[in-house]
C-alpha cells in the first residue's frame, strides 16, 4: 500500500534481552550527523553497553558506538558521542516517572531503518538476577532438546 514504510533492522541488542527484563518499549528517532547515518547504513553501529538517561527533559543515548567510515576523512564524527533521542513530550514525561522507580533503566534494543529514517527501539527495563538468567538458559536448552527430538 502507498504510505507504508518498510522496516529494516540494522543492529539488534540481543544481550539486553538476556540481561534485562523488558517492561515497555518505545520507538524513538535519533539526532544524527550525515556521516553517522552513512556508517549505520554500512553496519558499523554497536549497541552493546549503550544506555539512555533523561537529562533536563531530553532523552540522551550514551555509549552507542558508531565507527566512522574511512572515506569521511576530516568530517569524521566522534564514535562515542552522546546522541539525542527524539520522543514526544508525553512519552518523555511518562518515562521520567518510571525511570525514577528503583531499578528501572532505559536500554536500546534495536536500531532500524523506517523508510529513510534511522530509529531506535528503547526498552524500559529491570535488571535480571543471576538465577533468572540461569532459568532462561535452562528453558532455551530444553526447548532446543525437544526440537532435536522432534526432528529425529
Swiss-Prot record:
Principal subcellular localisation of the protein: cytoplasm
One GO cellular component, as annotated: cytosol
GO MF annotation terms: RNA binding
Subcellular localization, as worded in the UniProt entry: Cytoplasm
Domain of life, per lineage: Bacteria
Pfam families: SmpB
Family to which this protein belongs: Belongs to the SmpB family.
Function according to Swiss-Prot or TrEMBL: Required for rescue of stalled ribosomes mediated by trans-translation. Binds to transfer-messenger RNA (tmRNA), required for stable association of tmRNA with ribosomes. tmRNA and SmpB together mimic tRNA shape, replacing the anticodon stem-loop with SmpB. tmRNA is encoded by the ssrA gene; the 2 termini fold to resemble tRNA(Ala) and it encodes a 'tag peptide', a short internal open reading frame. During trans-translation Ala-aminoacylated tmRNA acts like a tRNA, entering the A-site of stalled ribosomes, displacing the stalled mRNA.
Protein name as catalogued: SsrA-binding protein
Species in which this protein is naturally found: Gloeobacter violaceus (strain ATCC 29082 / PCC 7421)
Organism classification: Bacteria, Bacillati, Cyanobacteriota, Cyanophyceae, Gloeobacterales
Gene name of the encoded protein: smpB
Amino acid at each position: 500500500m502507498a504510505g507504508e514504510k518498510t522496516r529494516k533492522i540494522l543492529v539488534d541488542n540481543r544481550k539486553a534481552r538476556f540481561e534485562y527484563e523488558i517492561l515497555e518499549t518505545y520507538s524513538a528517532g535519533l539526532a544524527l550527523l550525515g556521516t553517522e547515518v552513512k556508517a549505520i547504513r554500512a553496519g558499523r553501529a554497536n549497541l552493546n553497553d549503550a544506555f539512555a538517561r533523561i537529562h533536563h527533559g531530553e532523552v540522551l543515548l550514551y555509549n552507542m558506538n558508531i565507527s566512522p567510515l574511512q572515506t569521511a576523512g576530516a568530517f569524521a564524527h566522534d564514535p562515542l558521542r552522546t546522541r539525542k533521542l527524539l520522543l514526544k513530550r508525553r512519552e518523555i514525561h511518562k518515562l521520567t516517572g518510571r525511570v525514577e522507580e528503583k531499578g528501572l533503566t532505559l536500554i536500546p534494543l534495536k536500531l532500524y531503518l523506517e523508510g529513510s529514517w534511522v530509529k531506535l527501539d528503547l526498552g524500559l527495563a529491570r535488571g535480571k538476577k543471576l538465577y533468572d538468567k540461569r532459568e532462561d538458559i535452562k528453558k532455551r536448552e530444553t526447548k532446543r532438546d525437544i526440537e532435536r527430538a522432534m526432528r529425529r
